[in-house]
Amino acid sequence: MPCLLPTLLRATRAALLLQSPRVVAAPASQRLLSAPAQPAASPSSMDSAEELLAPLRLAVRQQGDFVRKLKEDKAPQVDVDRAVAELKARKRVLEAKELALQPKDDIVDRAKMEDTLKRRFFYDQAFAIYGGVSGLYDFGPVGCALKNNIIQTWRQHFIQEEQILEIDCTMLTPEPVLKTSGHVDKFADFMVKDVKNGECFRADHLLKAHLQKLMSDKKCSAEKKSEMESVLAQLDNYGQQELADLFVNYNVKSPTTGNDLSPPVPFNLMFQTFIGPGGNMPGYLRPETAQGIFLNFKRLLEFNQGKLPFAAAQIGNSFRNEISPRSGLIRVREFTMAEIEHFVDPTEKDHPKFPSVADLYLYLYSAKAQVTGQSARKMRLGDAVEQGVINNSVLGYFIGRIYLYLTKVGISPDKLRFRQHMENEMAHYACDCWDAESKTSYGWIEIVGCADRSCYDLSCHARATKVPLVAEKPLKEPKTVNVVQFEPNKGAVGKAYKKDAKLVLEYLGACDECYITEMELLLSEKGEFTIETEGKTFQLTKDMVSVKRFQKTLHVEEVVPSVIEPSFGLGRIMYTILEHTFHVREGDEQRTFFSFPAVVAPFKCSVLPLSQNQEFMPFVKELSEALTRNGVSHKVDDSSGSIGRRYARTDEIGVAFGITIDFDTVNKTPHTATLRDRDSMRQIRAEVSELPSVVRDLANGNITWADVEARYPLFEGQETGKKETVEE
């Protein structure tokens, strides 16, 4: 297959140069204007693959240098934004090529996997007998058990290990809360609508599908194809009017009816409702679980005897009214989240348990690596914190714990990386942000976010409610501190806002240092800033307010905690586990299985009588009761069919181990049975009375299968390879 990506790069750059010839891309002497097309590298040739990637890496590095220079020269923001858009386009091209060059055996057979998931009812589209609703899914017995085990392991790994305070908040959220958090104003995508039947589409997704269809037409010229490739490369960067122009230029119609479409409009992704019968209290289904934790900060602080640091967590469903859900569990309208908010003194971001994860080696994709065209590299976590790649050891500790959790539940370490947000991606209040990303058949997808959110959330809610959300820190010795506060000109504020002046003054009096510093910067740059309180907006200028800095002596210090927030998308984690653990038995393409770690396997063990002979039934009953007493979830399969066929059935739903009762169990004393390992298909023989505790210890991770094989004799009977496989 010919390499079209250098062409895509040139086309992207050309389109952007038309918008801003001065600053979009690096100077011509530093650009790759004619990188030759080359055949794709064979999976066995890493050198050949790197040759293909080298010019793309160079293109990213040069543009990253150019963006940095623009910022150093204090170029106009519009020029910086355009140059950053070009940088992101080059990054996407590089990453697409990296994924295209991965070995074929590294890619899961998604069609075969999805067939297994549907056939064994892991999950299915909700309301299927009514035609289904996109973006909503029901979990079947196997999927429900797998999801619950993923959640239970999360609880043990984080809440119990870290002694985190778990809470459970309502999903219904009044509008003012989400207005304060920014969700009402900013939580939106652009949408277009069929003008005749009202069918809605997400604008960027529809434009992408339409352009790809045009490009696949044999009559499409190379020039036109390059133009459309450049549009696709910067699709995430278009605003409302730019999208509207593109829909007109490319004559985009409804894909289902061919009707005209409305211009793109912002669509808020939250589900709106009204609380109470009067309809006077608008609200929303929560888009995240975090806000409930922030609002209960004071109560949680009291519960923790007023001490920092402490952490709170919540597991629950959140809702986003996606315009066009797709990609199975990756983009849905209702999903389960698990979020931790770790509250810490901003001046003491050192975690006492960081040494326990400091020696972990994991793939880190730093912001610097991204703007210089490098790939993620394996790095010791302790070195990453010491060298400042990761901002502080609290953030580093949670990244390490996240890595251990994800690999524990079945995500491949080689398909897991932590990507740092680039400066233009991070919210203005964030200190550092890293996403855990997994490689799937859909490419790299975010499954966990881990951000140092500074003091932003608590400060916002404190200003809106005029309730101080702070912790008191006793000082060993009195100290003199610098104080920053607003100094309002009451006369000017009163003249401008009259009866609302009191609202403005109260708001300014409740602001913390973080916010004041941000607004001070706006005052110096623009001469004004805007505040919002009790549903009203006020513009304040230099003659109305200034910033006063002075010193005072304190015996007790008030601290607005910084927040480290790990946020887990459990549906995406579950989907990644499904892909990373799906296998086809060597030599038998029809025999598939999931190699779930025992800790999350839907059933830890199966109990399988060799046949339906009634002599086996007392032992089936005895083992089932003993497994239940040991807390081992299990499945009894006493159906007809060969033992090999039943092994295949239990393997297909990821049952970790299998106990088989045969005639030796009945006829010999002491009574013994076989225990089979799903992944290796090897078996041992042990006394029936011992097996439940052995399976329990395997499921809890106290022992490994290697330990079991060292302790008990191997058995080779029920599954002897080729003959049994043929029978199945």
From Swiss-Prot:
Any one GO molecular-function label of the UniProt entry: protein dimerization activity
GO cellular component, one term: cytoplasm
CDD domains per the UniProt record, alphabetical: GlyRS-like_core, GlyRS_anticodon, GlyRS_RNA
Primary localization: cytoplasm
Keyword terms: Acetylation, Aminoacyl-tRNA synthetase, ATP-binding, Cell projection, Cytoplasm, Hydrolase, Ligase, Mitochondrion, Nucleotide-binding, Phosphoprotein, Protein biosynthesis, Secreted, Transferase, Transit peptide
Gene Ontology biological process terms in this record: diadenosine tetraphosphate biosynthetic process; glycyl-tRNA aminoacylation; mitochondrial glycyl-tRNA aminoacylation; tRNA aminoacylation for protein translation
Subcellular location: Cytoplasm; Mitochondrion; Cell projection, Axon; Secreted
Keyword Ligase: yes
Binding sites annotated in the UniProt record for ATP: R320, N321, E322, R331, V332, E446, I447, R572
EC number annotated for this UniProt entry: 6.1.1.14, 2.7.7.-
Phosphothreonine PTM sites in chain numbering: T725
Role, per record: Catalyzes the ATP-dependent ligation of glycine to the 3'-end of its cognate tRNA, via the formation of an aminoacyl-adenylate intermediate (Gly-AMP). Also produces diadenosine tetraphosphate (Ap4A), a universal pleiotropic signaling molecule needed for cell regulation pathways, by direct condensation of 2 ATPs. Thereby, may play a special role in Ap4A homeostasis.
Protein name stated in the entry: Glycine--tRNA ligase
The gene coding this protein: Gars1
